[in-house]
Amino acid sequence: MDCPHQDVLHLIKYFRKEWPVVSDSERTTICGADNMLLTLQLALAEVNKQNGKEFSVSLSDVLLTWKYLVKHKLGLACEDTVVPKDYADIQKTYDLFLKNSNSLDLIDIYEKISTAGSSEAHFLSSEQLLDFLTNDVCLSEGTDFPIVSTPCKNNLDTVKVKPTLKRIFLAYLNLLVNAKNDFALAQVLNCPERGLGREAFTDLKHTSRLKNMSIFLVATSFIRTIELGGKGYAPSESDPLRKHLKGLSLFVHFIDRLNEIFGETHDPRTAGELLLSTIKMHLIKGRGSGDPLSEAATEVAQDLDLRIKYLINLVSEDKSSGTTGISPVRPKIRAINRGTASGGRETIKTLLKLLDEEAANPPSKNKADLLCADEENTLFGAFSLFTLFRSPEQTGSSPKALSQRVQKAINKDKPKLKHNLIRSQFACTYKDSNLTQTKQWDFPSMSQVPSCIHPAPKIVPVLCFDEEPLENDLQKGLKQSSGNIDLKTAEQVKNKPCKNVGNKRSKRKQVDIQSETTNGQENEPPQKKAVVELTSSKANKQGVSRNKASKNKLITGQAKLTSFFRV
């Protein structure tokens, strides 16, 4: 053939014909040249992240690794070729991505057919496949080029969004055929807007790795468990998927709605038309008829519908002529689930042919537009693959964000208020918190002002001729701190002779001890018991002086009786 594109398509058709020999699943999807490049970009970024770097990769590194990967898998790499750094890990991650998505790339299909010993593989050599994947290939003479008219506002918008809308339609169809394809799910998870952004995709990705399931099966099982499982089987409240319950429910129910079309519609033409119409109406819901996105979605749906009908007509012509080369169809008289599960089998085969034709397309010429998608400009809420898979992974040992760590340190230094600042009448029974103590030091009362933090014992000179002024000062201090002392008792103490110097010294020592005790308990509220003890101790110390005065003390009413009898 003149064009490698037709050879690649012929190779894929033979793979579908002999799939029981070369593949494990009939619904294995094929990864085209563009998807191979996107998968390699994700593998490179994942390896960089495992090596302690960011989840990112430069465009030049992707293109250099891409050329070496294609040559190495085809066995055309020279010995003196420079091997990219960490190539073994990159290839392992690349193959793991494809395996988890139940997909095969074009090189894998070529190797499987060559290993099977089929003569069909000789129609396309490894050098031709290398040129097809790495270089700009020649197009056949009959290839139709899109004719673009003079740019206007509506036409320019339609031309820009058409390729993106086509990928969205094909991703939905790919997910219906192959439920394990995580790349197809990533393109349509939030398209249209369902509130399932990067955070939701990250939570789904982590859960799928823990359960060793595809992302779509994780979302489906989560919704089914909530709807049908009951309280005993419901997910825990700490499940990270619970906060995305509404969006996941909308997504799963829409896929269920598309799957119902397979079972209810037996004609593949009608089923394909209904599928495309349902996807289109779901995308343009809420938009006017003159909206550029609505017009572009309508055109893309019509083009895909025509291609599906064309493929069905080709199969009908081949069956009528009997030149298909495919084994005859088994009789359906005793087929299990006739009209239900097997009703959409022809539709699935038609969709697989449509997806295979897209996989056989040559790679995009502008690699920068393909790999470096605009993160801010999202159509219908759909993010690029690299943006979704770049979401940070949080584990138990992963450090938190810097803002969270700074806020935690600030909150740790702040004193916590345990009790209300308005103190009740029972405040003396509470233990003051650090904040209350700080407030007391900022605004102390007159009875709590300390002279110093560690007061030394006061040296009071005791002289007989200078005792009276010292007693006056002492009495003033006692009057301020103890209001329950009788004034008469204070006057008696003041008029005592100088011979009671020992008692006065003991009083001064007691006052000093009391002051030290007060300084040690300044944070405690003043208690009346201390005043009572001070008064009783003073009375005990003055017992000797009161014995003399008690001899002349009269009983109540004794003075009146004495004056009466004297008369």
From Swiss-Prot:
It is found in: Cytoplasm; Nucleus. One of its GO terms (biological process) is negative regulation of double-strand break repair via homologous recombination. Gene3D superfamilies: PCRA, domain 4 (1.10.486.10). GO terms for molecular function: DNA binding. The keyword DNA damage applies. Residues 512-524, 534-552 have a biased composition (Polar residues). It comes from the Eukaryota. GO terms for cellular component: chromatin; cytoplasm; nucleus. Residues 485-552 are annotated as: Disordered. Keywords: Cytoplasm, DNA damage, DNA repair, DNA-binding, Nucleus. Required to suppress inappropriate homologous recombination, thereby playing a central role DNA repair and in the maintenance of genomic stability. Belongs to the PARI family. This is PCNA-interacting partner.
